[in-house]
Amino acid sequence: MAGVEEASSFGGHLNRDLDPDDREEGTSSTAEEAAKKKRRKKKKGKGAVSAGQQELDKESGTSVDEVAKQLERQALEEKEKDDDDEDGDGDGDGAAGKKKKKKKKKRGPRVQTDPPSVPICDLYPNGVFPKGQECEYPPTQDGRTAAWRTTSEEKKALDQASEEIWNDFREAAEAHRQVRKYVMSWIKPGMTMIEICEKLEDCSRKLIKENGLNAGLAFPTGCSLNNCAAHYTPNAGDTTVLQYDDICKIDFGTHISGRIIDCAFTVTFNPKYDILLKAVKDATNTGIKCAGIDVRLCDVGEAIQEVMESYEVEIDGKTYQVKPIRNLNGHSIGPYRIHAGKTVPIVKGGEATRMEEGEVYAIETFGSTGKGVVHDDMECSHYMKNFDVGHVPIRLPRTKHLLNVINENFGTLAFCRRWLDRLGESKYLMALKNLCDLGIVDPYPPLCDIKGSYTAQFEHTILLRPTCKEVVSRGDDY
């Protein structure tokens, strides 16, 4: 439209310019000359309009080209958007989609840092965590195989119904695996036991994404040395230093929603203990292999003892038969309950009770060069609220306050004095003793064999799922 108006204006100017020229051609104007002039003007006016039209056509052509290019760009962007949707990398339209895609690409899938600091739940944003080692159940006493469980539709449905529970265990187990791998990269002689425990626990809290009673540490880090087999963690002021000739049992736990992973291993620097570690690891794996639905607990203990006692170890020129520590054992695990009632012996005898479908067990074995029996020794550091205790009236305000702190932060999970210190508690020893005397809290002092002996431990958590047995804490290390 603008092009047409421009052409008309241009024609008017031509008329004004031509009038003087026409008048100069003659003084008298005849009708014929006037007609000629009129035709000439009309012709030139047409030419001007034609020129304007050409310009309009040119502009229209340019607009068409631009529109075509724009459509082409839009089609290309839509194609890119479709590709992004297929890859799950973007959900915007056109340029916005491209921008989103770039942003996501830049961020990428999260990977673990060194040292580990990214929570396990962030590494697996879909909420599905790595499974442990899945094993077929052992044959029954009459020789029948348990392979049918893996294909049974009923058992598959039951297994799927508890998937959320199994998944909580797997998240806690993955945190345990990554923490212990990290610990093995830096633990060395010369470090204090407090330094080792605090560094381990700090990492564990990050990976499990500690959140009150919903996620966190299941019990204090055990770092029992030499003849001490279990339940030692340093209290404030403990100056014990890890030595080259020490044999250290690292036993720590993680939990998600009270689903506890109880898993332990032994650290040594002197190769003279290698056979002792091999014996205990073999015994633990034997216990795991024998465990299963309808298996008697005493049969598991008998198999463990047989394997462990088949080993002899020479330390400093003296030969010892490796003995299982008879008054230590594995145990069933319940929600927020590390010892849920059933015990898995590591020697012949014990309960004839059977393992049941859906149960969770900590299979742990302890080997010793001493008597193979432990007793309470040293200062107590581990405590745990009694799971079955009812309401007990408390008079002392300090004791009441401490119980509230325990209920809010630990519930029925085990804790240690260092953790009370960390919460800002002070002068609590009398209140803690009072809670123990009332039976509300149980103390768990360090358990030791005779002085001069050496003890080792390995432990895994297993899930007795309807379809198979899952060694959920299994890793590449053990």
Swiss-Prot record:
Q: What is this protein called?
A: Methionine aminopeptidase 2
To which species is this protein native? Rattus norvegicus
Record-listed a divalent metal cation 1 binding positions: D251, D262, E459
The beginning of the lineage is:
Eukaryota, Metazoa, Chordata, Craniata, Vertebrata
Q: How is the cofactor bound?
A: Binds 2 divalent metal cations per subunit. Has a high-affinity and a low affinity metal-binding site. The true nature of the physiological cofactor is under debate. The enzyme is active with cobalt, zinc, manganese or divalent iron ions. Most likely, methionine aminopeptidases function as mononuclear Fe(2+)-metalloproteases under physiological conditions, and the catalytically relevant metal-binding site has been assigned to the histidine-containing high-affinity site.
Compartments (UniProt record)? Cytoplasm
Give the EC number(s) listed in the UniProt record: 3.4.11.18
- Kindly state the subunit structure of this protein: Binds EIF2S1 at low magnesium concentrations. Interacts strongly with the eIF-2 gamma-subunit EIF2S3.
Which positions does UniProt annotate for substrate binding? H231, H339
PTMs per UniProt: O-glycosylated; contains 12 O-linked GlcNAc.
Q: Which residues are glycosylated?
A: S60, S63
Q: Give one Pfam family, short name only.
A: Peptidase_M24
What PANTHER family is this protein classified in? METHIONINE AMINOPEPTIDASE 2 (PTHR45777:SF2)
Does the record carry Protease as a key word?
A: yes
Q: What does this protein do?
A: Cotranslationally removes the N-terminal methionine from nascent proteins. The N-terminal methionine is often cleaved when the second residue in the primary sequence is small and uncharged (Met-Ala-, Cys, Gly, Pro, Ser, Thr, or Val). Protects eukaryotic initiation factor EIF2S1 from translation-inhibiting phosphorylation by inhibitory kinases such as EIF2AK2/PKR and EIF2AK1/HCR. Plays a critical role in the regulation of protein synthesis.
- Name the protein family: Belongs to the peptidase M24A family. Methionine aminopeptidase eukaryotic type 2 subfamily.
Q: In terms of domain of life, where is this protein from?
A: Eukaryota
Q: Which reaction does it catalyse?
A: Release of N-terminal amino acids, preferentially methionine, from peptides and arylamides
**Cofactors, names only:** Co(2+); Zn(2+); Mn(2+); Fe(2+)
Identify the GO cellular component terms for this protein.
Answer: cytoplasm
